[in-house]
Amino acid sequence: MVVPGRRTVWDCVIELTKMAQENCVDPRLWASQLSSNLKFFAVELPSTELAEVIVSYICWDNNVPIVWKFLERAMALKLVSPLVVLALLADRVVPTRSTQQAAYRIYLELLKRNMFTIKDHISGPHYQKVMISVSNILRLSELFDLDTSKPGVLLVEFVFKMVSQLLDAALSDEGLLELSQDSSSQWLVKSQDMEIDAPERYNEKTGSLEKLQSLNTIMAIELIAEFLRNTVIARLLYLVSSNRASKWHEFVQKVQLLGENSSALKHSKVLNSGDLLQLISNRRFGYSYDSKVTSARKSNAIVDFGSLSSYAGLCHGASLSSLWLPLDLVFEDAMDGYQVNPTSAIEIITGLAKTLKEINGSTWHDTFLGLWIAALRLVQRERDPIEGPIPRLDTRLCMSLCIVPLVVANLIEEGKYESVMEKLRDDLVTSLQVLGDFPGLLAPPKCVVSAANKAATKAILFLSGGNVGKSCFDVINMKDMPVNCSGNMRHLIVEACIARNILDMSAYSWPGYVNGRINQIPQSLPNEVPCWSSFVKGAPLNAAMVNTLVSVPASSLAELEKLFEVAVKGSDDEKISAATVLCGASLTRGWNIQEHTVEYLTRLLSPPVPADYSRAENHLIGYACMLNVVIVGIGSVDSIQIFSLHGMVPQLACSLMPICEEFGSYTPSVSWTLPSGEAISAYSVFSNAFTLLLKLWRFNHPPIEHGVGDVPTVGSQLTPEHLLSVRNSYLVSSEILDRDRNRKRLSEVARAASCQPVFVDSFPKLKVWYRQHQRCIAATLSGLTHGSPVHQTVEALLNMTFGKVRGSQTLNPVNSGTSSSSGAASEDSNIRPEFPAWDILKAVPYVVDAALTACTHGRLSPRQLATGLKDLADFLPASLATIVSYFSAEVSRGVWKPVFMNGVDWPSPATNLSTVEEYITKILATTGVDIPSLAPGGSSPATLPLPLAAFVSLTITYKIDKASERFLNLAGPALECLAAGCPWPCMPIVASLWTQKAKRWFDFLVFSASRTVFLHNQDAVIQLLRNCFSATLGLNAAPMSNDGGVGALLGHGFGSHFYGGISPVAPGILYLRMYRALRDTVSVSEEILSLLIHSVEDIAQNRLSKEKLEKLKTVKNGSRYGQSSLATAMTQVKLAASLSASLVWLTGGLGVVHVLIKETIPSWFLSTDKSDREQGPSDLVAELRGHALAYFVVLCGALTWGVDSRSSASKRRRQAILGSHLEFIASALDGKISVGCETATWRTYISGLVSLMVSCLPLWVTEIDTEVLKSLSNGLRKWGKDELAIVLLSLGGLKTMDYAADFIIHLRS
């Protein structure tokens, strides 16, 4: 026995081992003696120091079999940790394997024996200490650039290190390591104390060494395959693939290199190249939502996903209509002329396309094709639109031929690498080539046939060797062409893509793109013909040139730049001419350059201060004529929608505010003369600018917008403050946003106007009016002080508008405290007051109130009221906005008595009221909505609230011409909103009066009136939603079609296109045109959820026969019966969920989606009310419900938040709402709460939800709380969803890797 204190315990160990080695002591006896010594010295076992002593003793002076047996015995008795020993040997043996082949062979045997029983080596209290020792030995923190003491993380790194080192050794031994991208392997670094010289006793055994080396290489490769095949090891490696992507990519490349080039592998009896490559494939170490690989996920997969195969099956065989339904809905929704959006359609659709690609597991080819087909369907739905003040074909063509190509360009340019961008361009090419297989969608509307033919002609001329790029191609006569040059929508799309540099002219040579080539090219046109090319060369902007350029869109950015330069720097007449041209065809039909046209027009509204400008007045005054031309030129419904689609509304509003502020400060005596001889005053410029500004926010909507709880009505945030806030956000730069072509363009436009943030406070006069407008909405008029400037303005306006009436009667302004004298009224009635426009707008509410009060008391006839108000609006057209504001507030207050529309005092609707009501009923009936109370007939007289009667009487005094269009476009939607909010039948009465005025608008007016039915009858909303589901799913023979899909949902527009009858209105169109007026959007979303739940049962009953349904009940996942029927049913379930999510998102926006996910869905799961059915649904139907709900919730979230983290605000909201929902699920899985729904529904929902997140939205998983992830994974494990639980934990990142490793180790094999 060694005397304590004289020598260390490790000296004793070495001495004991040396004596045992010399005497050939049995390893068991050596181990027993060693154990006694260690206990004497109180050494804690297993001991890392002991392992280091023994390995150092072996390497290399005592590299003999008996000492290796000693080491093996110490490992068996857990005197040393096998993992520590393997780490030490990896550090000592592998780098010297060329000279220590026998030791290397023993190392491989020990590795094989211990790695596959790794669970046995980490159980116990010393787990963390052992792994820290392993990490120190192998320097894992340096290799993985991660300093951690979590044993699970260290275990994963250890496993990856051991397998990777073995792989590098095999590659090196075969001379293949130099062929890999990382030829200097970090795993083969030589040990610091390694002996270089080989023992002399092996020098004579070169032949046997070479044979042993060959066998060792084969064994190493076979061992690598066994590691990849082993469930526990492979799962641990999967954590590396999820969290160390670059290192895993290198590892995979090296295995592929080994599998494809190894000569030793050819001599293996148990492994071949194909097997090895299969073991490292993405099908085992990856996840995909692509149904094409689902069938390959068998028992050998690392991640089998369980129920995810059912989700992938949803995509199998699904039509484009079902996959891309949200695109069609968003495209059609953007055509609503009652709504402008502060967010660019390019940004919205780019995010939507990425979302649907991920959710559907689609390729970029399919994504691009889905975009093109949805865009073409949008155009085809309105080939012959009805007449009315609504967006027409120009807006739809803008979406199809400009916005969608810009979206595609955005998606391509988001590629981080040139190779990725090139692949995206290839997918674009193939999608456009496939588009040629849809001739029905490609037929151009009549108004663009000429443009399509010219696009085809351009391709033919190019292929024939002609160069028309610099000639007046825009005025070539198609009759001069010797071959048929008929074009279609694809030719226009290709030209739009070429203009954005995402295609080149090689597209012209695609098979079937054009009809052929020509041998004779038409002669060049004479130089004197006015066209864009001659203008660019310096031709003057005379009348002939302007007339030509207005009717023909520019073909290049250079042409627009030249025009913009003239508009800014030219003479006054040239500025007006250039602005006129910009507002022409280049705006409405210049699809290849439309984004630049919109940009230049917006910039023209913020012209620069001339360098030598020194006047006291604002420099905008000098641009009055040009500004007025632009404002009037972009004021049409289509033009405003085009600006909205391009995201220019915030900057447009910001540019209009200083114009309003400045010109509203001048009296009408300030005027200018246009080249045509027409005079315009400051009032005209102000009124046109002010009217356009008001169209950009929800000015024309009801003043009281009801939300539920803290959920605002959709769009209620569209205020001047909000528009400026969005505009100011464009000034903020970031690396991610700067890569976005659209965002960069919006930023440049904003900075061109001002590099500083702009606020409402910057415009004090506008702010005063805006606050008055808000006060008028909130309370009755008050505060008019006798003798004040406002009171004096009111008196002057009353004298001007009602002077003749006041000559004999009293007309009092509100709260004036006096009776107005009538003495001089008649003398002053023809005198026009000279007040600034802002002063008049302050007085208008009091003028209208006084007039309305006088009419109530009989001092003013209805005709005189309407005439006076029209005079006021003619005097200052902008006053119409304040009149609208006043009437809106007064109608909502409901304090005015109704008046009889009898044709004597007020206009009568009797002539066609019954016809209007009959048509409304027919429209609803053909859409599948039956409301008996709307049947025509009845003897009650037609009445309207006094303010509404006055309002409609005022509007019908306007002529329906271009001059009045921009003002009617402001008053019309407000009139409809007010009438819709009044008791029925106010809206039919208003529609009847207007159809008498504008007979050609009959279809539009009747359809508008039919939309308002849903505001008065909640059951009608439910019926319409039910019909949307039935039409989309094709579950019944609806008037439209029983085929289902987009065609049945959205049809072909709306209106009575047939003489003497009404064509059915598609339910989706009717819903999209009315939902914005719905106030309780939360309850609507609940109805949509209810319809989704019930539609699943309808799908099962329609798509699965009763016999198959019974068979499917008894067989898990229906794996033996009715595969085709089940696949069809699953496709329909996805379609129903997609429709539901889209409608909820559109109807309620972010607020309602948050309520749905946070409150509504959990409440549904907790509910136990099954009174509506005698017994619960079958297990299959219950599972289908779970699938539907999972897809519905994920798509709702994805539509609202996006699939990435571009917006920090969106990320925060997603974390909060999704986190709350998952915490609810975790609480249920932990047994803290109990759900009341069917177990099959609950389990399928959770499995489906997690499957969709991990396969389609991995970024979401990284944001989930660690404890929630643990609860979810434990719940999945209890249900046998082990692999899904592993994937979930792996995506949690480093924060869950420790738990994930422990989870994997302790799973049942």
From Swiss-Prot:
Function, in words: Component of the Mediator complex, a coactivator involved in the regulated transcription of nearly all RNA polymerase II-dependent genes. Mediator functions as a bridge to convey information from gene-specific regulatory proteins to the basal RNA polymerase II transcription machinery. The Mediator complex, having a compact conformation in its free form, is recruited to promoters by direct interactions with regulatory proteins and serves for the assembly of a functional preinitiation complex with RNA polymerase II and the general transcription factors.
Location of the protein in the cell: Nucleus
Stretch list, region Disordered: 809-829
Biased composition (Low complexity): 816-826
Protein name listed in UniProt: Mediator of RNA polymerase II transcription subunit 33A
One cellular-component annotation, GO: mediator complex
Keywords linked to the UniProt accession: Nucleus, Phenylpropanoid metabolism, Repressor, Transcription, Transcription regulation
Family recorded in the similarity comment: Belongs to the Mediator complex subunit 33 family.
GO annotation, biological process: phenylpropanoid metabolic process; regulation of phenylpropanoid metabolic process
Keyword Transcription regulation in record: yes
Free-text disruption phenotype from the record: No visible phenotype, but higher levels of sinapate esters in leaves.
Lineage of source species: Eukaryota, Viridiplantae, Streptophyta, Embryophyta, Tracheophyta
Cited InterPro entries: MED33A/B (IPR039638)
